[in-house]
Amino acid sequence: MMDTAPLRDAYRALLNAAATVAESGDTSPAPPAGEWNADQILAHVALVNAATITAVSSAATGATTTYDNRTAQDTWTLGRVIALSGGNAGLRDRIRLQADALCALGGPMLSETELDTLVPALLLSNGKVLVDQPVPLRDLITGLAEVELPGHTQQLLALLPEDRGTRATT
């Protein structure tokens, strides 16, 4: 059985960062050039979560699956997910529920054999191919906990005004 505590911790950190940014008083923190705003980051995470839930569910049924994160980087799709979720608070709720689902599905539900299922994967970041080969399902799940979610947590925190820490302590 896979230990999903690191995944749950990564989601908790991401959601705490998202709440901090939302509560910062800046209703739309400006991202650095070429980066996403907070809602776009959260929509991307929600889409990645949905793709991961699909892969996990497919493995549990014995169905063939693939994992492709290109849709999670499409600007139109991000905007649609933001609108359908009802904005920032809705995105955070969606991610929280997806986190609960992934931690339940990826932990006690899957056997070691299912976690070792090879999933053809295409993972891009900033237009560059990171992975284009089959990977074990467990690596998709641990990749969320170890790379994807912490990276987006930092991306969210980078949206905070630089004097935020100063104001919070004075």
Question: How does the language model describe each region?
Answer:
Residues 1-5, 51-101, 163-170:
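Short, helix-capping/interhelical loops that line the mouth of catalytic, cofactor-
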Residues 1-9, 26-48, 78-94, 121-148:
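Alpha-helical scaffold segments that form or flank carboxylate-/histidine-based iron centers
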Residues 40, 73, 98, 133, ...:
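Residue-identity detector for glutamine
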